[in-house]
Amino acid sequence: MAGSATIVAGLLLLVACACCIFPIDSVTIPSSCCTSFISKKIPENRVVSYQLANGSICPKAGVIFITKKGHKICTDPKLLWVQRHIQKLDAKKNQPSKGAKAVRTKFAVQRRRGNSTEV
């Protein structure tokens, strides 16, 4: 009797540990994933940046637009307006900023006969 009680207690302990290590019906979705998409077009002037929600990590591949107010909005990357927003944001990112100015530098140029001239 003591032997079978020990075996049953050991099995119950093993099952309890397995449930803690491998939770049943538990799926962790990263916070940077989209579970659903909005259907309404976001005005272009409200969007400041975007992130890609990777389909290999997330249940759905999506584009997360970040608005001026800091809201994160999941959108379907297959939609034409989403693709256009991405292209325009990428183009803005690659342009020099409006505050940037051309910098003039002076340096000596060595010419024949040892003369130097500033340019």
Curated annotation (Swiss-Prot):
Primary role: Chemotactic for resting T-lymphocytes, and eosinophils. Has lower chemotactic activity for neutrophils but none for monocytes and activated lymphocytes. Is a strong suppressor of colony formation by a multipotential hematopoietic progenitor cell line. Binds to CCR3.
UniProt xrefs under Pfam families: IL8 (PF00048)
Main location class: secreted
Ranges where the record places region Disordered: 96-119
InterPro entries xref list: Chemokine_b/g/d, Chemokine_CC_CS, Chemokine_IL8-like_dom, Interleukin_8-like_sf
Basic residues compositional bias, start-end: 101-119
Signal peptide per UniProt: 1-26
Similarity annotation: Belongs to the intercrine beta (chemokine CC) family.
Tissues in which the protein is found: Highest expression in jejunum and spleen. Lower levels found in liver and lung. No expression detected in kidney, thymus, brain or testis.
Glycosylated sites: 54, 115
Induction: By interleukin-4 and allergen challenge with A.fumigatus. By interleukin-13 (IL13).
Cystine pairs: 33-58, 34-74
Recorded GO MF terms: CCR3 chemokine receptor binding; chemokine activity; cytokine activity
Disruption phenotype: No visible phenotype in normal conditions. Mice display a normal base-line eosinophil levels in the hematopoietic tissues and gastrointestinal tract. However, following intratracheal IL13 administration, mice show a profound reduction in airway eosinophilia.
The protein, known as: C-C motif chemokine 24
GO biological process, one term: positive regulation of angiogenesis
Native source organism of the sequence: Mus musculus
